[in-house]
Amino acid sequence: MQNRNTFSWVKEQMTRFISVSIMIYVITRTSISNAYPIFAQQGYENPREATGRIVCANCHLANKPVDIEVPQAVLPDTVFEAVVRIPYDMQLKQVLANGKKGSLNVGAVLILPDGFELAPPDRISPEMKEKIGNLSFQSYRPTKKNILVIGPVPGQKYSEIVFPILSPDPATKKDVNFLKYPIYVGGNRGRGQIYPDGSKSNNTVYNATGAGIVSRIVRKEKGGYEITIADASDGHQVIDIIPPGPELLVSEGESIKLDQPLTNNPNVGGFGQGDAEIVLQDPLRVQGLLFFLASVILAQIFLVLKKKQFEKVQLSEMNF
């Protein structure tokens, strides 16, 4: 009887442990996978401001390069690749939220012209699917299918991101024309320095909020520091809280000024934006161009043949 009760208790505890583990995994998995899109989507109706600045730069303060490659021209209702490259030194490690060091993630936002959108899976070729890998793209808004976001994803595997894009057909979409259109892209590597609510992350430099003498430095049990700065003139004290991650630059007894850096800047990532142009080409115009080129080539051929015929006539008259 006692063995049966013990077995039931162990079974109950194991079931509870597994359930809690699954819940924690689902919650953390969701928060990590949605972190980059949510930060931009929750705070901004449009990721590109009227000035042309992409809003991701509000949180990722360092400026880094990004590159985009698209075809010069595409035909209507055609799937093509938009390749976004986010280069960085793969040896770099960033400060994670818990203060430890880890690999960098990357993310991107692609702003297409109205009418262009993510290609449906059944229109994507096997070769393109292999280039895309396991990436999962999503629209910035349900009503903005022309704006796509991705990330954060592992930077070591996806520093080059292939977006499968479907071009619109003006025959079915009356608001689309055969024109040259701009495409805008923003790409980041690493964590941001500021959260959307304006608070700092632990991936940035921390400055003194007061001037005076560092009277006390307390190292917290879970990492980070509590720094007390005393004003020698009136004895007023300010306390600056440093989260885990940044390295401390000051020591007790040191005299510091207002806004003087208390830590280093641990950020190794950054954000960049770029643009490209693409032409939505009219098939009739292409056919007309091909017909024109063919007619020019035929005219040249007939001209050469006529010239040879004329030379033969001249040669025969001279011999006569």
Swiss-Prot record:
The chain crosses the membrane at residues 286-306. GO terms for biological process: photosynthesis. It holds the Pfam family Apocytochr_F_N. Its main location: plastid. Residues 1-35 form the signal peptide. Binds 1 heme group covalently. It is found in: Plastid, Chloroplast thylakoid membrane. InterPro entries: Cyt-f_TM, Cyt_f, Cyt_f_lg_dom, Cyt_f_lg_dom_sf, Rudment_hybrid_motif. Heme binds at residues 36, 56, 59-60. Keywords: Chloroplast, Electron transport, Heme, Iron, Membrane, Metal-binding, Photosynthesis, Plastid, Signal, Thylakoid, Transmembrane, Transmembrane helix, Transport. Gene3D superfamilies: 2.40.50.100, Cytochrome f large domain (2.60.40.830), Single helix bin (1.20.5.700). GO terms for cellular component: chloroplast thylakoid membrane. One of its GO terms (molecular function) is iron ion binding. Its cofactor is heme. It is a single-pass membrane protein. Coiled coil: none annotated. It comes from the Eukaryota. The 4 large subunits of the cytochrome b6-f complex are cytochrome b6, subunit IV (17 kDa polypeptide, petD), cytochrome f and the Rieske protein, while the 4 small subunits are PetG, PetL, PetM and PetN. The complex functions as a dimer. Belongs to the cytochrome f family. Component of the cytochrome b6-f complex, which mediates electron transfer between photosystem II (PSII) and photosystem I (PSI), cyclic electron flow around PSI, and state transitions. PANTHER family: CYTOCHROME F (PTHR33288:SF10), PTHR33288. This is Cytochrome f.
